[in-house]
Amino acid sequence: MSECSTATDLARAVQARETTPQALLEAARRRAEAARDLNALISLNDRADEQAARVQVRLDAGETLPLAGVPIVVKDNLNVIGTRTTCGSRILANYVSPYDATAVERLTGAGAVIIGKANMDEFAMGSSTESSAWGPTLNPWDRERVPGGSSGGSAVAVAANLTPVALGSDTGGSVRQPAAFTGIYGLKPTYGRVSRYGLVAYASSLDQIGPFARSAADLALLMNVLAGHDPRDATSLDAPPAFRPGTPDDLQGLRVGVIREALEGNTPGVEAALNATLDALRGAGATVREVSVPSVQHAIAAYYLIATPEASSNLARYDGMVYGERVSAPDAVSSMTLTREQGFGREVKRRIMLGTYALSSGYYDAYYSKAMKVRRLIAQDFARAFGNVDVLVTPTSPFPAFRRGEKTQDPLAMYAADVDTVAINLAGLPALSVPAGFERVDGVRLPVGVQLIAPPLQDERLVALAGGLEGIGAVRMEVAPAS
């Protein structure tokens, strides 16, 4: 069995008694130790051996488990019982979760073994995984560059083969952009398709948990486990999963729309990868046409005037009284002030202040209310576009991974990194970043991604199309160097 085996292959091997959950766990730990310089993981799961042993007991009792023994990491904003959930922030440095997130519960119920928690931008606010209190995560393709964010640790864990699959969260592109920067798949499901129970909130109307993988079969495997209604999440949809990896036949007769507004400002390598993907689709029997979604030009402005007010509200609880590392002071007000001043990083403070301002008296109508109207307009424009095509295509990012420190002092430049992804969250649509090739920058090959977008609840179609693209050789999948 290859060190680069997929989750599908590993689960099959464990079920067939060709290996054991404990052996897979130990191998994953060795890979994680060898790649420590990437800083992909914040912590290891002390209960992983216990989980592996439980999986073995269930197998010995005759159970069939879809993720039997598969090692996986989850982003550090997902609660795992008995482990720290820090969200990449000092204010939660010692918070130990008393329960499992629904997504984690479903993974372990299917036989997966959680080996650790992945690094992330603080409270998922970032596009580079540089704002974590535990230091930046490095891109394995070029350690001088970022892996994207905010789910950079999860993406690197899969790209560098620490684990075959991982979980992240996507509020404005935080699964798809890191997937593009590291050369793997990253799926942002339809809003409500995967339960958010146990996910620490950034912007509740935008957050969605999504998987990283190196094959369409693994995406299908994970989504069949993760998706489905959860009564503990009021926004959870009752849409039973029916995912499959797909074949080239799924591309025959497909109507593809290329979003015109996403064709400007791309680097030559991104443009070449997009054109190669479109040519491959045409060759497989799809029709390709340009379509316009005019309101997407306002998506970044609307996104930050919706996400930051929600963040301001969600993060108000971290004051040291109930949640957060409390800083001692002579009185309660001083303690709360110091707790937030010392516990939050610069970017989190910036977004809290921006959100508070947008919600303040006299500015609500000018900013938040207007942004919500733009959000509805974006959803309507996407719905109109889908009246003529089955799937929309854009670059995932207009450029490959940028250098560490390049955008940290320019927040607007950092925010613009999500120009191709935020509109999808505003509209609640499913979208998948597909590894589409490489661009050589300063002598280094850097991955680039192409984004497939589908109407609501057509997540299955995206995974099937990924399998079809694999079948015609249009997916460029390579394991990144871990050391």
From Swiss-Prot:
Gene3D superfamilies: Amidase signature (AS) domain (3.90.1300.10). It is an enzyme of class 6 (ligase). GO terms for cellular component: glutamyl-tRNA(Gln) amidotransferase complex. Its EC number is 6.3.5.7. Heterotrimer of A, B and C subunits. Belongs to the amidase family. GatA subfamily. PANTHER family: GLUTAMYL-TRNA(GLN) AMIDOTRANSFERASE SUBUNIT A, TRANSAMIDASE. Allows the formation of correctly charged Gln-tRNA(Gln) through the transamidation of misacylated Glu-tRNA(Gln) in organisms which lack glutaminyl-tRNA synthetase. The reaction takes place in the presence of glutamine and ATP through an activated gamma-phospho-Glu-tRNA(Gln). This is Glutamyl-tRNA(Gln) amidotransferase subunit A.
